[in-house]
Amino acid sequence: MSSDAEMAIFGEAAPYLRKPEKERIEAQNRPFDSKKACFAMDDKEMYVKGMIQSRENDKVTVKTLDDRTLTLNSDQVFPMNPPKFDKIEDMAMMTHLHEPAVLYNLKERYAAWMIYTYSGLFCVTVNPYKWLPVYNPEVVTAYRGKKRQEAPPHIFSISDNAYQFMLTDRDNQSILITGESGAGKTVNTKRVIQYFATIAVTGEKKKEQQPGKMQGTLEDQIIQANPLLEAFGNAKTVRNDNSSRFGKFIRIHFGATGKLASADIETYLLEKSRVTFQLSSERSYHIFYQILSNKKPELIDLLLISTNPFDFPFVSQGEVTVASINDSEELLATDNAIDILGFSSEEKVGIYKLTGAVMHYGNMKFKQKQREEQAEPDGTEVADKAGYLMGLNSAEMLKGLCCPRVKVGNEYVTKGQNVQQVTNSVGALAKAVYEKMFLWMVTRINQQLDTKQPRQYFIGVLDIAGFEIFDFNSLEQLCINFTNEKLQQFFNHHMFVLEQEEYKKEGIEWEFIDFGMDLAACIELIEKPMGIFSILEEECMFPKATDTSFKNKLYDQHLGKSNNFQKPKPAKGKAEAHFSLVHYAGTVDYNIAGWLDKNKDPLNETVVGLYQKSSLKLLSFLFSNYAGAEAGDSGGSKKGGKKKGSSFQTVSAVFRENLNKLMTNLRSTHPHFVRCLIPNETKTPGVMDHYLVMHQLRCNGVLEGIRICRKGFPSRILYADFKQRYRILNASAIPEGQFIDSKNASEKLLSSIDVDREQYRFGHTKVFFKAGLLGLLEEMRDEKLVTLMTRTQAICRGYLMRVEFKKMMERRESIFCIQYNIRSFMNVKHWPWMNLFFKIKPLLKSAEAEREMATMKEDFERAKEELARSEARRKELEEKMVSLLQEKNDLQLQVQSETENLIDAEERCEGLIKSKIQLEAKVKELNERLEEEEEVNSDLVAKKRSLEDKCSSLKRDIDDLELTLTKVEKEKHATENKVKNLSEEMTALEENISKLTKEKKSLQEAHQQALDDLQVEEDKVNGLIKINVKLEQQTDDLEGSLEQEKKLRADLERIKKKLEGDLKLSQESIMDLENDKQQVEEKLKKKEFEISQLQTKIDDEQVHSLQLQKKIKELQARIEELEEEIEAERASRAKAEKQRSDLSRELEEISERLEEASGVTSAQVEMNKKREAEFQKLRRDLEEATLQHEATTAALRKKHADSVAELGEQIDNLQRVKQKLEKEKSELKMEIDDLASNIETVSKSKSNVERMCRTVEDQFNEIKAKDDQQTQLIHDLNMQKARLQTQNGELSHQLEEKESLISQLTKGKQALTQQLEELKRQLEEETKAKNALAHALQSSRHDCDLLREQYEEEQEGKAELQRALSKANSEVAQWRTKYETDAIQRTEELEEAKKKLAQRLQEAEENTEAVSSKCASLEKTKQRLQGEVDDLMLDLERTSTARAILDRKQRDLDKVLAEWKQKLDGSQAELEAAQKGSRSLSTEIFKMQNAYEEVVDQLETLRRENKNLQEEISDLTEQIAETGKHLQEVEKSKKQVEQEKSDLQVALEEVEASGSLEHEESKILRVQLELSQVKSELDRRVTEKDEEIEQLKRNSQRAAEAMQSMLDAEIRSRNDALRLKKKMEGDLNELEIQLGHSSRQVAETQKHLRTVQGQLKDSQLHLDDALRSNEDLKEQLAIVERRNGLLLEELEEMKAALEQTERTRRLSEQELLDASDRVQLLHSQNTSLINTKKKLEVDIAQCQAEVENSLQESRNAEEKAKKAITDAAMMAEELKKEQDTSAHLERMKKNLEQTVKDLQHRLDEAEQLALKGGKKQIQKLEARVRELESELDAEQKRGAEALKGAHKYERKVKELTYQAEEDRKNILRLQDLVDKLQAKVKAYKRQAEEAEEQANTQMSKCRRVQHELEEAEERADIAESQVNKLRAKSRDVGAQKMEE
């Protein structure tokens, strides 16, 4: 567990992820009684903590923490884990695994806000209901690249593990985030996406933003997709404020390097019913309330809405605000996400408009018409707003809602709707618009996230709506809960089955327990054939089905038969329920009201048609692919045998299909599970409801995991780890000094400990423990450590005290010695002779000391050099060791990948074998068909024979008829007429026969064409098979190279094991590895542990080397001190030289005195001898030390040489193993070639069978030709038979025969049509097989690319190792040169020192001469050895140069081969791409031609319509002009009236007093009012006409736009051709990349050569070591000789390889020629494609000219149509005539039959008369017969001529019928156009008539007004005259008054 310092990288999140170190220490030191601490069951809190007070029998008394005393059964009390397991991060590591331990661990971690906890393989998270700082950027950085055990539990850790697994295992991953609604799934999903977007950034430069667009990077877009989907797909529910009301599976795609490549989102089951209905405590989707928040006021104005949610019933049925959500800020985030995701401004406005329109839909009101069932709109204001936002005509929309058009049979009728039906229809349309808009947004986001970058793997994140139990549960809840049921079953199967499979894999005895089947009953109840969904879909098929019938069927089928289906028992006050299902998470009551309508999801097709024509592009696009009942009917009539179209799929069927796809995706990935828990129902932070959490734990499978832990062995440790950790429990069980396998050691260790054998099991690689045993072993280990530490401390203390005592004693003895010596010295200190001795002694010993110093210095320098060399060798070996370890690891990874590739290859081989079996089955079927054809042929031969028999019988009949001709003299004319009629009938029958034969021939030709097409497809399949074989050969080559790498890896394994000193055991492990994969894994892990031990040893050696380096430094310092002393000694020596001469004189004087005092000096001489003996002893010790040092160095050299020899032997062994494996590889290749030859033989046999089929068909055609000849013969016989028409009975017999022949031919025709259908079916099967082969080819190419990438990575790693080795060799060379230069310098210094010593010390001349002679002899031996070494080096250099030349040639050849192979592959790929492109271009050309013809037809119709419209416009303009003129006249009359009115007003002002004026004024006002009404009416009519003209203009504009869109389509096709060209250029770039790969392979071979050179350099180093020792030199010479032998063998092998490469070079040159031919072919095809492209462009340019030509052709076609109509009329008349003649012939036939009978009777009478009449009568009759015969011949000639004329006429009739058919088609097409135009003309005429009627009414009104105006004028004149009269009277009266 990490320390606080290590947790500092997590920043402020550290305390929320792992408990601090202080708390951990306190927990470990806390007093704990494991026998008393427990958990007890409690009714209130489920489980409580307590202490056991007592136990009696099966009863336990427990005292809880709140001072309660409980008496419980023993099975209700559970032991508590030690304190160190408190808040443990992985609950599977607990000592005691049970429910209360899991519950309290989660609770305590939740109380500390550690919301993530591991539970074995998956992670459990608890919703905190508050923000925690655990998702900050520093946390993301801290978790990056961390293993699971290295960091605390977190969703980031799960994500990073999935990412690392994806990169290492090269497998797709998935993260399944499941839990109940409100558990925090959506938040965790966002965090996972945040993590991937942060750690796997693409690394590309940001794209330049387009003006007007704010488009982010791929990471930003992936992150911003979530807010947008949440706004439109999340809503507040009872349990969750931000509940996802749809499921999503987000796939994040990565490239081969782990960088983000792209992403896509799949959504499931959007809850669209929430758009129109919410419960009281819920609300609709967030986007509605975000818009209403008024954060963007422009949206309020744009959508014509208010800011009050209660104004819109669709969004205000529940709550409208959520405390935890700021709708204003969320709106800005949503708007920003739309911009970042690249939506255009038009699309953005369309989204908002449709959202506002959905809100307006809820305000639309309808009412019932009086006395009718019909509904009508209650106001149109809301509909106008909705229509404006959706780009619709509101009146048409309301009409479509109230009176939709329904198809009844083949006609459309208008159906009346009541208010409820209209309301339901409005809600369904609102839901459909919202759902389709949401799905379109998802598709649009996927388009934006698809960057077209290469992607290798993906990580899928699943966020599905959680399990839901509401008061009212409908179909949506059933689908959601069923999804969770399936996911839970997947989880159970994956977690528990894998756990048990590991037991079986490890070889543990285990009875398999299937936990995954616990949910099968509920799943089958829902989805089985007679399950709930099946019954629901069946009911939807019946038109009269109701919810009640659906419920009754459910009860009949499941009630009482399935335990999971129950009758509900709803509590009072809750919603009604119809049935209950027992899910894994609880029992749910479902209400089936409206399920049938929800499942069928019907829409008002009339309104949908308006949507398709909407001016809002987004809305029209959403419903462009909608197919209603009409489309369904038409589709059904065409393809009645197929399934219903997608538009007829029910909601449940679509849901199940998507769910099955999801489960398939999940099964193909490696899943990682995250289980989200709800702590409480009140959303209170920090509070945990025990019952609720336990219910979820039981449902989510956490407790099942505990159950399998109880039964199984949850704790497991590798054998090596167990041995290392628990060896302390009984060290004597594992003997020291000898190697013992970790498994055996673990078995011995456990058997020696007092542990129950049932508590553990031994696997192949691990030891498994029951729950709790590992904790017991830990306690035993702690106790053992305590005792050992106590004992060790006592021993250490005793040892330290003994050392201290020993030092004290040594100090005491040394003090005594010093005291004695000082006393003795003080006694002789002042003795004269002592002074003399002090002076002479240094002089005597100085020369000898100098010699000793020189020798010591030489020895020191030599030892120093040897130490440096040994250090260099040690470092080199260490580097080699590291490189070998690295290569071993790389090869292990490569072996894993190779085994996977081998498995893939085996699977592909099995697939080929299966395809072979299928081909054999097809061959068998063809043989059976051949037999059937032979049977048909035999039947035809039999029929032919029967016809021949019939012909012979007819001939006989004809002979009989010729005999009877002489007897029909009197009835000649009648018989001739009858013969003519019958001959015409026969010709008609023969024509029918000829028609049937022609049809038969046409069917045979179609049959032959189908067979030819089948042959072509089979040839294509054979070509694909050959290509597949080539690719498989390439993959075999790659696999061979990878197998070589495997061999190298195995060899390196053996080298490593030899270095470890256990070669025999390693070889056995290798054999086990080849026999058993599981043992391989165990041995690998064991060896990895041993490698770690070796690594520790190497570390120890490094530490030792550091110590030696320190000693070397100390010795260097000592040497410097000694050199300083030598310098001081030299100075003193110079002084001594001066004093020597003085002393020599004094010596002569003293010698005389010494002779006198010889007795005194004898004691002194003895002392000198003693001192010399001591000095000699010290010298001997020094020499022994130097000899010992040399011996150790020699031993080290010998050991190193032995190790090198062993390595050489190992390399030899590896070479032999490599050869053996290459032989095996060649054998495998031979087997593969055999398989390929078998496949070729099968294909050849298939072609032979097809050839036989063709020959049989040729025979069949020949037989048919013969049959035709026979029919011709029959025709001739029938012509002969026409002469003899007197025998009615035989004629009728022939007619019957003809009818039977016709029936047989029709049967044959039916058989041929059946064969044709069978051939078509086979052709479809062949195309499917071809597609499957193409898919397999694509997958094999993909595998090949993967293998190539792996090979390149391995080669790069190998290159790095080679670079490291070359670096080490260069360092060795540097050391060698340094050593040689240092040696030369030091020899020169020695010679100078020797000269100085010779000059200064004459006494040492003899010694120096001896030393010099010795040095000379050593120099001679050195030179001799150096010469031998040089010779050997020359030999080695020659061999190495030869080998280098051969290697270089080999590399060049390999490079050429690789280049040409790659070019060949690239050319093949280019050829295939070009062929595909040519085929696609041909199809596009064909499509363009068809489109062109359609455009011509449309243009022709549009021109005619345009012409008609222009004529109508001209008519309308004339009418408008006339009305304008009329208006001008009215205006003039109006002005006149106004003028007169003004005059009248002036007159009226004068006579206001008069009462009659008021009456006149009222009349005038009425006149003015009528005039204004007339004017307004005329203005309105004019505006309506203007609008109609505008509408016509818009229609013509739309037609022009349609033409423009077609031209745009042509431009797009041209762009597609350019894109194809770019794709081909990209293929060329890929070929260049492959060329680069081949160059890298060449570099890798060069690196291999460098390794060989490195080995040669190693041999040179061994030769250098031989200079220092004669024995070492001999051994190394022997090694070099052996190596030379090996090199000679290798040279021979290289020569053989050179010959082989020469052969391969010739083959490659031939392949090069073929490839160049193919390249030229591709180039020519490319140029032809470019030419075709130019031609297409020219054709497009000529389209406009051809359009005008087509107009002329259309006029000609009209004339032809008229002619065809007349011809058709004539043909109809002729047909009628022919029918009349046939009826007449029928009547004649009946008459002839009667006359034949009469003639027969008369003939009999004539025969009797002839017998009686005699010879004269016979002669007369004979003459008469002759005349009749001549007349008959003439009549036959005339009949033949008539037949010829009839045939000619028939041919003419056929030609006319064919032309009439073509003309009829043209006429029909023209008639359709005419009908359309006539309908339009009628409409326009109707409008014109209405306009004329209105104009007439206006004119009548105008005339009436004019008439009234004239009357008013007359009245005004009368009034004026009266006024004048009154004025005159008034003047008279005034005059009279004046006069008076």
Curated annotation (Swiss-Prot):
InterPro entries: Kinesin_motor_dom_sf, Myh13_MYSc, Myosin_head_motor_dom-like, Myosin_N, Myosin_S1_N, Myosin_tail, P-loop_NTPase, XRCC4-like_C. Keywords: Actin-binding, ATP-binding, Calmodulin-binding, Coiled coil, Cytoplasm, Methylation, Motor protein, Muscle protein, Myosin, Nucleotide-binding, Thick filament. Residues 1929-1940 have a biased composition (Basic and acidic residues). Residues 659-681, 761-775 are annotated as: Actin-binding. The modification N6,N6,N6-trimethyllysine is found at residue 130. Residues 33-82 form the Myosin N-terminal SH3-like domain. Residues 1886-1940 are annotated as: Disordered. Belongs to the TRAFAC class myosin-kinesin ATPase superfamily. Myosin family. Fast twitching myosin mediating the high-velocity and low-tension contractions of specific striated muscles. This is Myosin-13. It comes from Canis lupus familiaris (Dog).
